[in-house]
């Protein structure tokens, strides 16, 4: 099974200048836990609901009214390719201890997102079990 067979297709990204409050509203409206951040046609980061809490709200100097995606995003994003075997992507998620991976095509354009939930719906039980254990392990 390939990543393209299980991923969420057509994921959009937002600018690093997008207000954090808007990010939270987008997450709520679309029932999602992360939003890719792009600039000049390149994926430059990701913001998760956890980033907003841990890098933002938990910080005494954080100003939610002024904060942008750039203030809370995680950079150095790892991806997988749409033609990768799902097993390869799952092992990548385990190693990185991440619940989501952006998916790129041969032209290095983001075409989707694969999540732990996607793995749960489509992967064999043994692969799913290993992924959940790896991703859930304490950092």
Task: Please give the residue ranges for each predicted region.
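The conserved cystathionine-beta-synthase
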Residues: 13-31, 79-97, 104-105, 123
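Tandem CBS (Bateman) regulatory domains
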Residues: 1-10, 48-79, 85-94, 113-139
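A glycine-centered beta-loop-beta connector
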Residues: 27-30, 35-50, 93, 101-117
């Amino acid at each position: 099974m390939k990543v393209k067979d299980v991923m969420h297709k057509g994921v959009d990204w937002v600018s690093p200048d997008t207000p954090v409050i808007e990010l939270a509203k987008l997450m709520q409206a679309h029932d999602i836990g992360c939003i890719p951040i792009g600039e000049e046609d390149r994926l430059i980061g990701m913001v998760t609901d956890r980033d907003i809490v841990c890098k933002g709200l938990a910080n005494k100097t954080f100003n939610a009214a002024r904060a942008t995606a750039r203030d809370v995003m995680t950079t150095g994003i790892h991806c997988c390719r749409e033609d990768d075997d799902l097993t390869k992507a799952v092992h990548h998620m385990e190693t990185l201890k991440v619940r989501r991976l952006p998916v790129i095509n041969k032209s290095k354009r983001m075409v989707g997102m694969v999540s732990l939930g996607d793995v749960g719906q489509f992967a064999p039980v043994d692969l799913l079990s290993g992924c959940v254990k790896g991703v859930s392990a304490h950092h």
